[in-house]
Every structure is written in C-alpha cells, then in structure tokens.
Amino acid sequence: MAPQPLRGLVPFLLWCLSLFLSLPGPVWLQPSPPPHSAPRAEPHPCHTCRALVDSFNKGLERTIRDNFGGGNTAWEEEKLSKYKDSETRLVEVLEGVCSKSDFECHRLLELSEELVEAWWFHRQQEAPDLFQWLCSDSLKLCCPSGTFGPSCLPCPGGTERPCGGYGQCEGEGTRGGSGHCDCQAGYGGEACGQCGLGYFEAERNSSHLVCSACFGPCARCTGPEESHCLQCRKGWALHHLKCVDIDECGTEQATCGAAQFCVNTEGSYECRDCAKACLGCMGAGPGRCKKCSRGYQQVGSKCLDVDECETVVCPGENEQCENTEGSYRCVCAEGFRQEDGICVKEQIPESAGFFAEMTEDEMVVLQQMFFGVIICALATLAAKGDLVFTAIFIGAVAAMTGYWLSERSDRVLEGFIKGR
C-alpha cells in the first residue's frame, strides 16, 4: 500500500491546539526526601538515665531562678518553702526534661514518671541523690562509680581508683561491660599498675606511678638512655648493652616467594617483586636476575627484551608483528581487519546523506513530526492573542487541510480509475 503522508495530521493539529489553549498553571516539583541515614547506635540505658537526671537537676535550678530573685527576701522565703516541693514545680521541671527529638529520654521518662513523683513527694529527705535512687537502686540501670556489670562488681584497682587512675574500666557505672582495664599509653597490667612494654618506672609511691619511654628499640629498660636497655624489641638484638638491627634477609627468618627478593628494614624486612625480565632475582632491576624470563635474553649482566619481530613470526597474509615487553603479537595491517582468524580487507562504505538509509514510512513520520511542531508553535502564539500569528496559524491549518483533502481525493480518483 502506498504511504499516506498526512493521514491523521488534522486531528493531531486540533488536539495540539486544544492542549496549548488549556495549559494548566505551573507545576512545582516537590523536593525529594533526604536519603535515609545509617541508624545510630542507641546509648546505654544508664547513660540515658544519667542525662535525664542531669536535665532534671538543671530544671530545679531554672525554676528557682525564674520564679524568685526579685529582692523581697522575706516574701521569697515564705513562698519558696511552699513552692520548693510543690506539684507545680515538679510539672514545670518535667516538661523541660527531654528535648522534642530525644526519643530515648521520652521513653525512659514515661516508664519512670511514677517513680520520680514518689521520690519528689516522699523520698527526697532519705535519698537526696536522685541518680542513685532512680537509676541505680530503683531501675537498676546503673552501678555506683568504680563498679560494673549486672552485680555491680568492683573494677580492677578498687572502687576508689578503678584501673589505678591510669585507665578506663569497661562498663564502669553501668550494668554492662567486662570490667577490663583499657590502660593509657605506657601503662599495663590487670589494673594498669605496671609500666608497659617499652616504658620504665620513672617514679612510684603508694598512690602515684610515672612511666616514661625507653630508648628507641628497647622493650625493657632501667632508664631513658640507649645503654639502659635490658631487652630489645622483635627484630633487634642486644649487643654490648645496645639494641642493633637484625638483618633478617641473611637468615632463615625471611620467607619471600620465588619471584621476590628481600629488603631489610629497621626491626623487620619486606619482600618485593622481581623485575618482569627475571626468573628469580637477588635484588631490584634486570641486572639482579638469577635467570632470564621467557622473551628475554642475557646481554652482559642484564636480561633484556628479545625482539621477536626480527624473525618471521607472523606468517599470515596481511599480518604484521608488534613487539611487546617479553613477547610479541600479530595484528592485521592497516586497512584490514581480523575475521575468522584471517585478515580481510575492510569495506569502507561510500558517504551517504542523513536520509539515505531511511525508509519511506520513516520519512512520512519525520514529515508529520516536523509539520506538527511548527503548527503547535503557531497555535501557542495565537492562543496568546497575537493577531498576526493567529492569521498565520489559521492559514497554515487551512493549507495543511487542503493538502490532506487533495491527497485523499487523488487516492479516491486513482482507485476509481483502477476499478476499486
């Protein structure tokens, strides 16, 4: 069937016009929601309880400061005695204890509000420390200072100076943790009561320990000088009261691979890869090879690349050789490409225009799109009340409609003549 270039074009133009005449107002894009951040680790319940009590105590100070301090001392003392333990003050304090975004605080306050009220009205005198009464004794979320774990066991070094004052007792003050002492640099032992590796006792008494660093590679020493070494760190050896570096590369301690060589460093060693030209080596570069790798040959004291392309290694028709480091490759000569293992001549197509490869139907679609865009643009300008463009638009629609009708008439006449 012959192509029908403008079939359906008039309905398309009418739809285009109605679309532009009924354009809605601007559509505002809503900002996309922020990406979900990684969940944060929840704080230990004891830390939440401590923060709640700290905020409660600040609220007590705030309510006194905001409600009194006007200068009339007698009146303030009379009113303060009534306000101090009143329900009004408690409500004011509790309202400001948790920030709006602190979910953990709000959850804990909801669970413990009755306990706080009981302490406020009945237990303040016998238990003035709200933290101890609420967090440790009642809710059992915390332990006294210097203790840890479900049973509030003493930290190493005792409750008065956990970890000797030179470390942190894991879980101290909470119902969790292992009680292990994380000692400061230079200190060691179960309760951080000793000097660690590489440090010596510079000062010690019944309550005080000062650990200072040994000289460089010393592991144990009696003082800061090099001659004070008693034991050396790994990779060093004590020689005439001094620590000297051990050359592991000359011993069985160095365990490098067959394609590596050993390099001594201070207190240790490292293995580095041999050069590509080497099949085993004693050092860096092609001049330290034990044997040459395939594709290399001994030239003097070095292993150098063999140029395989100097001999006929690419016998295929229209092939040429390219030398590479330690090898070679066969490629097709310029103007040829590889196909099924052989080099065939490339067929360079003659230059063709943009429309040369388009089918007739594709040309029809492109034609319709072009005319549609022009008419839609004219319709938009005409819809804005521009008389000139309105006239042009009406004329264009009329011309296109006439063309479409004439094409249709031609097809009807052609069918009649052919006896359709």
UniProtKB/Swiss-Prot annotation:
Membrane topology per the record? Multi-pass membrane protein
Span(s) of short sequence motif CXXC: 46-49, 278-281
Keywords, in A-Z order? Calcium, Disulfide bond, EGF-like domain, Glycoprotein, Isomerase, Membrane, Redox-active center, Repeat, Signal, Transmembrane, Transmembrane helix
Q: What's the Enzyme Commission number for this chain? A: 5.3.4.1
Drop me one GO molecular function for this one: calcium ion binding
Enzyme class, first EC level, given as a word: isomerase
Signal sequence: where? Answer: 1-29
Q: Note the coiled coil stretches, chain numbering.
A: none
- The residue ranges for the Extracellular side of the membrane come to 30-362, 406-420
Check the record and name the InterPro entries matching this protein.
DUF3456 (IPR021852), ECM_structural_protein (IPR050751), EGF-like_Ca-bd_dom (IPR001881), EGF-like_dom (IPR000742), EGF-type_Asp/Asn_hydroxyl_site (IPR000152), EGF_Ca-bd_CS (IPR018097), Furin_repeat (IPR006212), Growth_fac_rcpt_cys_sf (IPR009030)
The EGF-like domain extends over 153-193, 305-342
* FU repeat boundaries on the chain: 208-255, 268-315
Glycosylation sites per record: N205
Give the Cytoplasmic compartment stretches of this protein.
384
The chain's disulfide connectivity reads C46-C49, C155-C169, C163-C181, C183-C192, C278-C281, C309-C321, C314-C330, C332-C343
One short Pfam family name for this protein?
DUF3456
- State which residue ranges cross the membrane: 363-383, 385-405
Q: Which GO terms describe its cellular component?
A: glutamatergic synapse; membrane; synapse
Task: From the Swiss-Prot or TrEMBL record, state where the protein is found.
Answer: Membrane
Major localization class: membrane
- Reactions performed catalytically: Catalyzes the rearrangement of -S-S- bonds in proteins
Q: What does this protein do?
A: Protein disulfide isomerase. Promotes the localization of acetylcholine receptors (AChRs) to the plasma membrane.
Give the protein family.
Answer: Belongs to the CRELD family.
Listed name of the protein:
Protein disulfide isomerase Creld1
